[in-house]
Every structure is written in structure tokens, then in C-alpha cells.
């Protein structure tokens, strides 16, 4: 007795059409969402404690956070998003002039924190920090948005691949 065998054959198009504009729009949307969430993390008013996200006083840090999707070139397809404070050529940001303030927040400042004449912060003369390091809010934003970013980018890549129309 012969084994049952069923075979369906169909022609598959050789070429797939890739919609670059759709993928670039997806990266722009990802940049906008990450920028929004990073700004929300630093918008809490009031004084911040060491290890917390930076507090909001003048709004310069929050307004400086921007994103950029680079243009495509012969060496680079342009499928990436840069999100950072003081992002050059960034969209939706105002640059911070002077010293790079986010670096002071991340690394902290010890200079000028020695015990001086006005050492009434405690018996030891303070903590040794003029500005203690704060939380890295950009890394926290990336962690929060990581599952959504993967899902959204995979969906847009899938939808941007279409088979070429036969004529």
C-alpha cells in the first residue's frame, strides 16, 4: 500500500519590496516616545536625593533632551535613533550652553565639598559630595520602553516587507 502524499506547489516571487520610508517613520516614532518618557522622568519638581532622577528647577535639562534619526548615506542605511540630552541636529530640543550638565549629574561633584568654616551639616562635616550622583534617567527610559520598542519595530519591519507585484 502506498503512503498518502499530498503536495501543493505555487510560484513565489523572487523579489521582495522593502519600504524604507515606513521603517524610518517607525524610528522617528520610537525616538519621540523615548524622548517623551525621558522628559517625564526629569520633570518631577523639587529637590532630588542622591540616586533619584534629577529634579526639575529651570527645565533646561528636560528641554534639551532630543532625538535624531540620521539620514541614509552610501555607508549607512539610516535605521537608528539617537536620544540624548543636547543631541546635535536633534528634533524637539534646546541645547544647553556651557558645561555639560548631565555629566555632573551622572558622575557627581566632589570639588568644594571639604569641611570648611560652615560645616554645620553634621559632625563629620557633610557627605564629601558637593553634588552626589543621580540616577541615569536615559538608561531607565530604555529599560521601561524596551519591550514596546521590540514589538513595534518587529511589527513595522514585517509590514514593510511586501512581495513584488507580478506583471
What does each model-identified segment do?
Residues 1-94, 100-167:
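Short, Lys/Arg-rich flexible segments
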Amino acid at each position: 500500500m502506498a503512503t498518502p502524499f499530498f503536495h501543493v506547489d505555487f510560484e513565489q516571487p523572487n523579489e521582495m519590496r522593502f519600504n524604507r520610508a515606513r521603517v524610518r517613520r517607525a524610528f522617528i516614532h520610537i525616538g519621540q516616545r523615548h524622548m517623551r518618557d525621558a522628559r517625564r522622568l526629569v520633570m518631577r519638581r523639587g529637590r532630588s536625593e542622591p540616586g533619584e532622577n534629577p529634579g526639575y528647577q529651570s527645565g533646561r535639562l528636560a528641554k534639551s533632551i532630543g532625538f535624531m534619526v540620521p539620514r541614509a548615506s552610501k555607508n549607512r542605511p539610516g535605521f537608528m535613533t539617537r536620544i540624548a540630552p543636547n543631541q546635535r541636529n536633534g528634533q524637539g530640543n534646546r541645547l544647553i550652553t556651557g558645561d555639560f550638565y548631565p555629566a555632573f549629574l551622572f558622575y557627581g561633584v566632589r570639588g568644594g565639598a571639604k569641611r570648611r568654616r560652615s560645616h554645620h551639616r553634621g559632625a563629620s562635616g557633610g557627605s564629601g559630595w558637593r553634588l552626589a550622583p543621580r540616577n541615569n534617567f536615559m538608561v531607565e527610559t530604555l529599560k521601561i520602553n524596551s519591550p514596546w520598542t521590540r514589538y513595534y519595530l518587529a511589527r513595522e519591519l514585517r509590514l514593510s516587507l511586501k512581495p513584488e507585484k507580478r506583471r
